[in-house]
């Protein structure tokens, strides 16, 4: 992308990168590192025409989270939205950041978590 002078990278993190959660130290810290990598790459590759951003999803209803059952709903209830996201809601944020409509967005970490990290 940098050789062509155009492109967009959208990393996918997690809301758990923004606050401590019991039992999530390794996962959360690795995703917090991804947030910093997003910003560092934005600084490094932005001048070469490549935008780098990240989406940090909250609880999301997927095949992978189906086994969580009611725990997913309880986790989501802690956010202002009060419900889990659909995979489409997360995908829409990724598509937006990858699109030309986000052409002036560099190094952003977008929480798509129903407001959990805000409240």
Regions found by a protein language model. Name each.
Residues 6, 83-112, 117:
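C-terminal substrate-recognition "lid" of short-chain dehydrogenase/reductases
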Residues 14:
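Residue(s) in the substrate-gating loop at a strand-loop-helix junction
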Residues 17-19, 118:
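Conserved catalytic-site region of short-chain dehydrogenase/reductase
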Residues 20-24, 29, 46:
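Active-site "substrate specificity/gating" loop of NAD(P)-dependent dehydrogenases
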Residues 30, 38:
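Active-site helix of classical SDR
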Residues 43-47, 103:
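Alpha-helical segment proximal to the catalytic Tyr-Lys
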Residues 47, 57-79, 89, 119:
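A glycine/serine/threonine-rich, flexible loop-to-helix segment
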Residues 51-61, 98, 111-113:
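Conserved SDR Rossmann-fold cofactor-binding beta-strand/turn motif
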């Amino acid at each position: 992308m940098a050789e062509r002078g155009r492109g967009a990278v959208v990393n996918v993190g997690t809301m758990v990168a923004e606050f401590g959660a019991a039992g999530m130290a390794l996962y959360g810290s690795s995703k917090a590192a991804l947030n910093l990598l997003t910003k560092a790459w934005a600084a490094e590759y932005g001048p070469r025409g490549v935008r780098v951003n990240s989406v940090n999803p909250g609880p999301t209803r997927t095949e992978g989270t189906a086994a969580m059952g009611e725990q997913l709903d309880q986790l989501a209830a802690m956010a202002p939205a009060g419900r889990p996201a659909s995979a489409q809601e997360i995908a829409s944020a990724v598509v937006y950041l990858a699109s030309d409509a986000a052409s002036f967005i560099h190094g952003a970490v977008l929480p798509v978590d129903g407001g959990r990290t805000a409240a």
